[in-house]
From Swiss-Prot:
Pathway: Protein modification; peptidyl-diphthamide biosynthesis. One of its GO terms (cellular component) is mitochondrial outer membrane. The keyword Oxidoreductase applies. Residues 60-168 form the FAD-binding FR-type domain. The chain crosses the membrane at residues 31-51. NADH-dependent reductase for DPH3 and cytochrome b5. Required for the first step of diphthamide biosynthesis, a post-translational modification of histidine which occurs in elongation factor 2. DPH1 and DPH2 transfer a 3-amino-3-carboxypropyl (ACP) group from S-adenosyl-L-methionine (SAM) to a histidine residue, the reaction is assisted by a reduction system comprising DPH3 and a NADH-dependent reductase, predominantly CBR1. By reducing DPH3, also involved in the formation of the tRNA wobble base modification mcm5s 2U (5-methoxycarbonylmethyl-2-thiouridine), mediated by the elongator complex. PANTHER family: NADH-CYTOCHROME B5 REDUCTASE, NADH-CYTOCHROME B5 REDUCTASE-LIKE. Signal peptide: none annotated. This is NADH-cytochrome b5 reductase 1.
Length: 309
C-alpha cells in the first residue's frame, strides 16, 4: 500500500522542492515563471515515481537491515523498529504472513548454529521506511534472547514472506480469532486490514478472544480497543488467568463455553484463526473440533476452517 499523497515523504520530496523552484524563479525573473512551472512539474513527476513504494523482501535469501529503535514495553517485551533501505521502501508482506529472522547462535561446544524464527510485524506497508516487530523474550528462546541483546545500529538478517495464510477481502462472512500473548500480532494485521480497508459492501465480522496472564500482559490493547471503537464489526473479548479486582472479562483459560459465547458457530463461511503458545493452540484445536468445527491439521492450509499460524 502506498503512503498517502499528504505524507511527509511527498511533502519533503516533491511539493516543497517544486514550490521553491517556482517561487525562486518568480522573485529573480518573473518572465520565466511559466518555464519554472514546467520544470517543477517534470521534476516533481520524476521524483513522485522515484518515491513509489519499493518492495524489499526476498524469500530466497536473507538481507541485512539496521535496528533503528528499541522500545522496551516490559521486562521481557520490546518493539524493535528495523530500518529499510530507503524512506519509500516497504516489506510488501501479504496480510497474515510473516518474516523470518536469522542469527548465528553460539553453541556449548564453541561452534555456532544458524537459528531462524518467524515473526509477524505490527506495522504495515502504509508506513514505509521501517518495520516494527513486537517480540517477547523467553529464557530458552534463541532468537528472542538474541534480539533482546542487540543494540541500536546493529544489523538484523531478514527473509520472507513466509506463511500459508493470506487475507483477502470478503474471504469469509465471520472470523473467530483466539490469541495468546504475542500471538496477537497476526490477528492485529488481519483485523486492521478488515477495519481500515473495508470496501463498500464488505460486511466481514470479527470476534477476537485475547488471553493473557495479567492485565499488564495485554499487548497492543490500545490499538485493539481503538479498532473496536472504530468499527462495530470487530469485537474483542479479553481473558485473564489472574484478573484484578473488579475484572468483568473472562477468567482462566479459554474454554469451550467462551468459544460458544463469543465466537461464530461452525459454518462454511466461518473461519477460526489460532495463534499462541503451542500447548494453548493444541488445546484449542481439540476444543474447536469438539464444538463441531472441522478437525485442524497439524500444519494448517489456507482453506482450513480452523487455521493455526
Amino acid at each position: 500500500m502506498a503512503p498517502p499523497l499528504s505524507s511527509k515523504v511527498y511533502v519533503d520530496g516533491v511539493y516543497i522542492p517544486a514550490a521553491l523552484i517556482v517561487i525562486g524563479t518568480a522573485i529573480v525573473k518573473r518572465d520565466w515563471v511559466v518555464y519554472s512551472v514546467a520544470l517543477a512539474l517534470a521534476l516533481g513527476t520524476w521524483k513522485f515515481f522515484q518515491l513509489k513504494p519499493k518492495k524489499v523482501l526476498d524469500p530466497t535469501k536473507f538481507q541485512e537491515f539496521e535496528l533503528k529503535e528499541k522500545t522496551i514495553i516490559s521486562h521481557n517485551v520490546a518493539i524493535y523498529r528495523i530500518q529499510l533501505p530507503s524512506p519509500s521502501s516497504i516489506l510488501g508482506l501479504p496480510i497474515g504472513q510473516h518474516i523470518s529472522i536469522g542469527a548465528d547462535i553460539p553453541q556449548p561446544d564453541g561452534s555456532s548454529k544458524e537459528v531462524v524464527r518467524s515473526y509477524t510485524p505490527i506495522s504495515g506497508d502504509e508506513q514505509p521506511g521501517y518495520v516494527d516487530l513486537l517480540i517477547k523474550s523467553y529464557p530458552t528462546g534463541n532468537i528472542s534472547k538474541y534480539m533482546a541483546g542487540l543494540s541500536v545500529g546493529q544489523s538484523i538478517r531478514v527473509r520472507g514472506p513466509k506463511g500459508a495464510f493470506v487475507y483477502q477481502p470478503n474471504m469469509v462472512r465471520h472470523f473467530g480469532m483466539i490469541a495468546g500473548g504475542t500471538g496477537i500480532t497476526p490477528m492485529l494485521q488481519v483485523v486492521r486490514a478488515i477495519v481500515r480497508g473495508r470496501a463498500a459492501g464488505d460486511t466481514t465480522q470479527v470476534d477476537l478472544i485475547f488471553a493473557n496472564v495479567t492485565k499488564e500482559d495485554i499487548l497492543l490493547k490500545e490499538d485493539l480497543d481503538a479498532l473496536a471503537a472504530e468499527d462495530k464489526g470487530f469485537r474483542v473479548h479479553y481473558v485473564l488467568d489472574r484478573p484484578p479486582e473488579g475484572w468483568t472479562g473472562g477468567v482462566g483459560f479459554v474454554t469451550q463455553d467462551m468459544i460458544t459465547k463469543w465466537l461464530p458457530k461452525p459454518a462454511d463461511d466461518v473461519k477460526i484463526l489460532l495463534c499462541g503458545p503451542p500447548p494453548m493452540v493444541s488445546g484449542l484445536k481439540k476444543a474447536t473440533e469438539a464444538l463441531g468445527f472441522k478437525k485442524a491439521r497439524p500444519v494448517s492450509k489456507l482453506e482450513d476452517q480452523v487455521f493455526a499460524f
